[in-house]
């Protein structure tokens, strides 16, 4: 038990490595705001490239206007959202590989995904391989 008492002193004396960096960082209160992470305005860009951000923004606007104007698509997207909630998935959370495998094997998901893809194709939104490759490369650069 005495070891825990001296843990903070040990992390100060030892050189800072990745393993004890978390211990060092957690010594400070969580209400402390670091200057390098504080911003004056939110960052709404996905990529640092303005051309890519503009293309992605146009695609998002086109897809959202299609969902708003097409009641059938809005119903399918709502069913897809309920389907994901059934598996315990929430927006912003990363699912486990096992959950992804279960979802992709479900016939209801396959049917919903095919229907939504067909509606997007009819409206002119397609999976352009060149654009998807560009998005993939830009996402790799960010990591």
From Swiss-Prot:
The keyword Transit peptide applies. GO terms for cellular component: mitochondrion. The keyword Transit peptide applies. Residues 1-38 form a transit peptide. It comes from the Eukaryota. Its main location: mitochondrion. This is Uncharacterized protein PB1A10.16, mitochondrial. It comes from Schizosaccharomyces pombe (strain 972 / ATCC 24843) (Fission yeast).
